[in-house]
């Protein structure tokens, strides 16, 4: 999963991070940390996610990996990272050529080092299979065939095609109900149709027409919504001051 690279009014960054068990910071070996890095990393660190740092484009002639690593460390300190988060693993990579290594003198052949590090460093998802189905709606997804769909991570239980479910808002009020007409599970970047989804899966569901972002899609017996970051209301700020220009008149 990926987050927006900037602050917004919809709290989308926070909701996307709710689906994650770890975080990878991909930074340019020459340019270093960009302005958007600070906002997203602050949210990720605040949620207790442990980062993996990848220094990308290491084959650039103007790369400066040591300085960039120091910049990343200083940024994490400024953002309030704890000791465990500051002890982050580092990989050097070239996304264009498709390789990542722990040390620059290692053979540069594939991304196995990254995949192995994810398995070692990122904790397993904390899921409760035995509880009734509940999923937090994180994003809306439009499909020309399925219509209005909801994207989210299953927080507990399992759900099957044609199962009757309801949607409740953050106050626990029922806002929609219906039947799960389609289930798609993300496998990498692919969307795979499935008959059943379970806790820990990131999925797309179809069948509800009124449910929206931050609602809990759940079994009919569930009464309490999953915790979520609400959508901020539309905001406009205006500053009115005295015209102090020498040309005022």
Identify the residue ranges that each predicted region occupies.
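Structural and coupling elements of P-loop NTPases
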Residues: 1-249
């Amino acid at each position: 999963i990926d987050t927006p690279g900037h602050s917004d009014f919809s709290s989308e960054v926070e909701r996307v991070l709710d689906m994650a068990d770890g975080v990878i910071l991909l930074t340019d070996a020459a340019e270093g940390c960009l302005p958007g890095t600070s906002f997203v990393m602050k949210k990720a660190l605040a949620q207790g996610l442990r980062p993996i740092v990848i220094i990308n484009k290491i084959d650039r002639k103007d790369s400066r990996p040591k300085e960039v690593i120091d910049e990343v460390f200083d940024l994490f300190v400024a953002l309030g990272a704890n000791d465990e988060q500051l002890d982050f693993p580092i990989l050097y990579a070239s996304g264009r050529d498709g390789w990542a290594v722990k040390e620059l003198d290692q053979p540069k052949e594939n991304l196995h080092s990254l995949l192995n590090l994810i398995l070692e460093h990122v904790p397993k998802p904390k899921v409760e299979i035995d509880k009734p189905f509940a999923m937090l709606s994180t994003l809306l997804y439009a499909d020309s065939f399925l219509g209005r769909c909801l994207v989210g991570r299953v927080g507990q239980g399992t759900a099957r095609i044609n199962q009757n479910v309801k949607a409740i808002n953050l106050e626990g009020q029922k806002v929609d109900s219906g039947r799960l007409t389609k289930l798609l599970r993300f496998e990498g970047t692919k969307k795979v149709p499935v008959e059943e989804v379970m806790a820990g899966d990131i999925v797309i569901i179809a069948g509800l027409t009124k449910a929206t972002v931050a609602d809990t899609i759940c079994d009919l017996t569930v009464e309490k919504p999953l915790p979520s970051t609400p959508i901020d209301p539309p905001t406009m700020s205006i500053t009115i001051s005295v015209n102090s220009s020498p040309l005022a008149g």
